[in-house]
């Protein structure tokens, strides 16, 4: 990966970035209104409908008790990983090409974690009783099982949110100061508070670099451990096709894979609609394309190992569960996942494809569609076909 693709003056960069914040035209408000309308129609209206009619409105049944909510939770947790994780790795390796992308990638981490937390609230069904799950003294004597992987999730994800927030905020302090010096009114007051009196002295830069590097080293194993713990929600059960020791690396690789694809999508949007073509260049897409190729090969290898060991073990439950996933009711989704996540990314072997913006956009979207399908298949197929035939059933998401 080559050097800095942006030999531009910092003054020009600051002016362009600040202009995108303070100079909001009609296009900005149209985009904001569209995003809010889609959120209202696609999320809040269905959620209110579910709150009124019950969790069955989402198609929940027996044995499909997790449905798309758990799949969505895993997907958004995974999508959050590459933002901070990739930024930490590139910072430690001193890769200068990260400068044009790392702040937006880190912002994707925070938004993805917020959406993942919202998926938990939706899945509860009756969120006004969510305090029953908290470990506080009460007359119902309902106590969380501290040995449960679900409680591991809460601790790990809370720690990851805290660490990522501190990491992103610390790196943004000089940016807040740059915006502070170029704004007036309430914006100046807000960014003055956020910048903590940053002046840009050598001493401040030295301390910031030391603390930023320390957090980067800390967050890398933290991010890996978070998705490993999420995988234990499944791997520590005795359900066929879930009780696998390979689930931790499988989930971690999948999380980095989907997160990297998400970064490609975000980078395209910033380049196209915010006129950052000078800063987000072919070099960024080229390097991200190489990373997608490597991750797709790792992901494909783990899938091959999972299928091979499942059939090679000779365990009837595992064999039946894998056969059902490959050739049963959900088989079209499985082969769609393989096509989007294992076959199409091979196009990244060609530099002409990696440096083409629109094809890379469609590939990144296809990869995340495939990765969401993977999470859905993990949840749906494993619960649909267990040991006893009288426990078999189908889960189909409601419209």
Where are these regions (language model features)?
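Non-cytosolic membrane-interface motifs at loop->transmembrane helix junctions
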Residues: 66-67, 101, 240-251, 323, ...
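Central hydrophobic cores of alpha-helical transmembrane segments
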Residues: 359-369
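C-terminal TM-helix exit segments that contain a strictly Trp-centered aromatic cap at the helix terminus
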Residues: 43-49, 117-127, 302-309, 371-380
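Transmembrane-helix bundle segments that line or gate the permeation/cavity pathway
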Residues: 2-8, 48-58, 62-66, 73-202, ...
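Long, contiguous internal "core" modules enriched in hydrophobic/ aromatic residues
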Residues: 19-23, 27-47, 138-337
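Extended C-terminal subregions enriched in glycine
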Residues: 332-357
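Hydrophobic, membrane-inserted alpha-helices
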Residues: 15-19, 112, 340-347
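Short, Lys/Arg-rich, polar N-terminal cytosolic tail immediately upstream
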Residues: 1-24
């Amino acid at each position: 990966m080559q050097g800095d693709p942006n030999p531009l003056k910092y003054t020009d960069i600051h002016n362009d970035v600040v202009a995108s914040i303070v100079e909001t035209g009609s296009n900005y408000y149209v985009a904001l209104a569209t995003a809010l309308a889609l959120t209202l129609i696609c999320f809040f209206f269905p959620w209110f409908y579910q709150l009124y009619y019950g969790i069955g409105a989402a198609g929940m049944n027996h044995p499909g008790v997790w449905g798309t909510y758990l799949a969505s939770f895993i997907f958004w947790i995974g999508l959050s990983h590459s933002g901070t994780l990739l930024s930490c790795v590139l910072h430690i390796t001193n890769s200068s090409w990260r400068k044009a992308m790392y702040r937006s990638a880190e912002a994707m981490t925070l938004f993805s974690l917020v959406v993942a937390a919202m998926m938990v609230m939706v899945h509860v069904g009756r969120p006004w009783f969510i305090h029953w799950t908290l470990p506080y003294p009460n007359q119902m004597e309902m106590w969380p099982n501290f040995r449960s992987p679900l409680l591991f999730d809460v601790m790990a994800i809370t720690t990851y949110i805290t660490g990522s927030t501190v990491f992103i905020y610390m790196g943004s302090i000089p940016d807040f100061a740059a915006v502070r010096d170029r704004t007036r009114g309430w914006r100046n007051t807000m960014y003055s508070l956020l910048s903590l009196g940053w002046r840009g002295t050598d001493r401040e830069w030295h301390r910031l670099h030391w603390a930023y590097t320390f957090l980067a080293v800390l967050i890398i194993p933290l991010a890996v451990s978070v998705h490993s713990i999420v995988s234990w929600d499944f791997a520590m059960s005795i359900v066929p096709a879930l009780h696998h020791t390979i689930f931790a690396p499988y989930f971690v690789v999948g999380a980095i894979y989907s997160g990297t694809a998400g970064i490609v999508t975000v980078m395209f949007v910033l380049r196209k609609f915010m006129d950052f073509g000078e800063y987000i260049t072919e070099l960024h897409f080229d390097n991200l394309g190489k990373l997608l190729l490597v991750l797709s090969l790792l992901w494909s290898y783990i899938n091959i190992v999972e299928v091979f060991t499942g059939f090679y073990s000779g365990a009837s439950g595992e064999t039946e569960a894998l056969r059902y996933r490959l050739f049963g009711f959900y088989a079209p989704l499985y082969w769609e996942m393989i096509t989007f996540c294992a076959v199409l990314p091979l196009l990244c072997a060609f530099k002409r494809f990696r440096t083409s913006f629109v094809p890379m956009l469609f590939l990144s979207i296809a990869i995340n569609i495939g990765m969401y399908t993977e999470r859905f298949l993990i949840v749906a197929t494993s619960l649909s076909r267990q040991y006893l035939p009288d426990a078999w059933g189908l889960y189909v998401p409601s419209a």
